Design a protein with these regions (language model features):
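Beta-strand-rich interaction surfaces with strong enrichment in secreted/lumenal proteins
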Residues: 95-103, 163-169, 209-210
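Short tryptophan-centered beta-strand motifs in secreted/extracellular beta-sheet-rich domains
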Residues: 42, 110-112, 172-188
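Secretory/extracellular carbohydrate-interaction modules
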Residues: 47, 80, 85-150, 155
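Short, aromatic/His-centered strand-loop micro-motif at the edge of beta-sheets
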Residues: 155-176
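Extracellular carbohydrate-recognition regions
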Residues: 31-60, 221-222, 231-235
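Predominantly extracellular/luminal carbohydrate-interaction, adhesion, and secreted-enzyme modules
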Residues: 127, 201-218, 234-235
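Extracellular glycan-recognition surfaces and repeat-rich motifs
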Residues: 49-84
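Short, solvent-exposed beta-strand-to-loop segments that form ligand-recognition rims
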Residues: 166, 189-209
Length: 235
């Protein structure tokens, strides 16, 4: 009698394990409901022009904020194309900006790969997010000349430094900047290494974009955006 009861118990446990092995069923459900990723690789865009979904901001003196265009190059991270800022001149506070039309993101996971090409006054580039316009946004940027990574809050065209991280940046290879932002909490990664974890409550949502400064010429590639489900109330 005891043996039959034990056999029934074993069969019952086996049926549960087969139906939901090690909780993978739950993981699969989460994956199915994960927010989709929107990505710009620029590989199907026409070289020599700006992709139609992007627009160029305005510099402090009213001129277009850089010369942004798709380039065909064998230096692309994911060939054949990159999005490049090619204006190789500019004043100290000439911020070269391009933003994506029709995107309003609050909580997000955003990344881009960049390759520093040239620059004497400045070099490198960065990510813009939660942008109200081309003068109000968050910015994470990497500068090979200064050998650092910084995150800023930009208000009315003026940068306010939030944090600095000293980092060796090799100009001969591609690098990646990534930001996750939920509520006020932002985490920023450089080549998969976390460099910032901070809270700022200035901007709640907005556009995304790319950024360079002064005379920096930079290639950008593989720009993925994932809208994240909010776990915070607006603060």
């Amino acid at each position: 009698m005891a043996k039959r009861s034990m056999n029934r118990l074993v069969k019952s446990l086996l049926s549960v394990m087969i139906a939901a092995p090690l909780g993978f069923g739950t993981m699969e459900t989460q994956a199915e409901t994960a927010p989709p990723v929107q990505e710009w690789s620029f590989d199907h865009e026409q070289p020599g022009v700006l992709p139609s979904q992007f627009f160029i901001g305005t510099m402090f003196d009213g001129r277009p904020a850089g010369e942004w265009q798709v380039l065909a190059t064998d230096r692309a991270k994911s060939p054949p194309h990159v999005l490049a800022q090619v204006m190789a001149k500019g004043a100290e506070h000439a911020y070269k900006i391009t933003l994506v039309k029709g995107i309003v993101a609050a909580d997000l996971n955003l990344a881009v790969s960049f390759l520093p090409i040239q620059g004497q006054a400045d070099m490198g580039g960065g990510l813009i997010w939660r942008a109200a316009d081309d003068r109000n946004y968050y910015l994470a940027r990497a500068n090979p000349l200064e050998q650092n990574i910084r995150v800023y809050r930009v208000e009315n065209g003026i940068r306010h430094l939030l944090q600095n991280f000293n980092q060796t940046i090799d100009v001969r290879r591609w690098h990646t900047l990534r930001v996750t932002h939920q509520g006020c909490r932002m985490n920023i990664f450089y080549d998969d290494k976390q460099v910032f974890d901070l809270c700022d409550k200035s901007f709640h949502d907005g556009m995304i974009g790319l950024w360079t400064k002064s005379d920096a010429v930079t290639y950008f590639d593989d720009l993925p955006l994932q809208h994240m489900k909010s776990t915070h109330t607006r603060q």
